[in-house]
Amino acid sequence: MNTRDTLKINGKGHLEIGGADCVDLAEKFGTPLYVMDEAYIRNMCRVYRDAIEKYYDGNGLVLYASKAFSCLAVYKIVKQEKIGIDVVSGGELFTALKAGFPADKIYMHGNNKLVSELEYALQNDVGTIVVDSYSELDTLDTLSEKYGKRQSILIRVNPGVEAHTHHFIQTAKTDSKFGFSLSDGTAEKITEYAIRKKHLKLKGYHCHIGSQIFEKQSFILAADKMMAFIREMKDKFAFEADTLNLGGGYGIWYTDEDAKISCDGYAEYLQALIAEIAAKAKAYDVKKPFLLIEPGRSIVGEAGITLYTVGAIKDIPGVKKYVAVDGGMFDNPRYALYQAKYTAVAANRANEKPTEIVTIAGKCCESGDIVCANVNLPAVKTGDVLAILSTGAYNYSMASNYNRNLIPPVVLVKDGTAEYIVKPQTFEDLIRNDVVPERLQ
């Protein structure tokens, strides 16, 4: 088990996170329960922030990719750590503004931003909008004129770098729905078009090659391609980008199949990337751009676990043993989407050695409702508390009320003390927005 300094086994043989006993958490708050370690989140913010300060003389900004985990308390933590935020919807923007983020540190993404979302961004002086289509560029130019602004923008570019990860989270393939391709010339054409817009100020480019990537070389290759493109645009249009956003995608540990990247390791990723940017700036005779990076999963992923209570156990002789829990795809759809792998721990018997391989199933009425497949556990019993590790990213943020199940609450742990940061839902919440027409009364 990769503890990453947030998890340990205490004298009772129970799993702890951030100094809090997971069995006690399950008893106090119930299950399913998302648990987040505040210290881990803060530390990862500092790792990235300090690396830019150390290796790039502070000529950049870390943006938390908030789609990984979105709630007011986490946004507040990120803001307090003096990094920026990227948002991909009106709802995420609303949350960032409510959390008090300075508008100039908010970057807005999305391949199909609604007109209402663009207007909302302009009305609230959002610092930079990342443009992903001609229609968006035209709409934003018109809206900027309407609001008397000259909006700063980046253009999302697809550098054509193949990242070795699940194909659903590769975002820089030639056929991706995101960005303008370098290979077919569309990135060049949109640049020429954008610099003629009177009410938009093109600051530079954004790219993002995918998620859960461990190969340093993939990021370096993307940086190389982007710096070469910056030089091309300088030569062709006398436009020299002053901002380069290289996105995020740094991998985290889910199982022992994954690399265990230390905090220093993440800093070394940035050090290598920054060295390449500096070298290419010199080689191509362009200025070193203001650098933006967008870590999300690596800030919150390993900070979180999910606690479940074991219910029914079904052993199909010679085939498979199912251990059913009180959660499932409504609180973690990643297995259904990506066949995601996780590590499971019997939180109330954490010092016991695994004795069997089981599949942890959810309670939804779906055959594909699996939390994690083929995991090693001791012989668990009904009532045991299971912890699924590294669930801080893309679990709560992707949760739903499927089968009219309640989305679990979230508690934040600091120095052994846990507090709600997302309250439990109630059955009343499920029907709060339901409307029954008069004819059906």
Where are these regions (language model features)?
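Activation segment
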Residues: 26, 254, 333-334
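Active-site loop/helix belt of alpha/beta enzymes
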Residues: 160-312, 403, 414
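Short beta-strand segments
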Residues: 65, 152-158, 206-208, 245-247, ...
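A charged N-terminal "starter" segment
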Residues: 1-129, 134-152, 188, 192-201, ...
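Charged (often Lys/Glu-rich) extended helix/loop segments that serve as interaction or gating elements
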Residues: 286-441
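Conserved active-site and cofactor/substrate-binding residues in soluble primary-metabolism enzymes
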Residues: 20, 36-43, 69, 135, ...
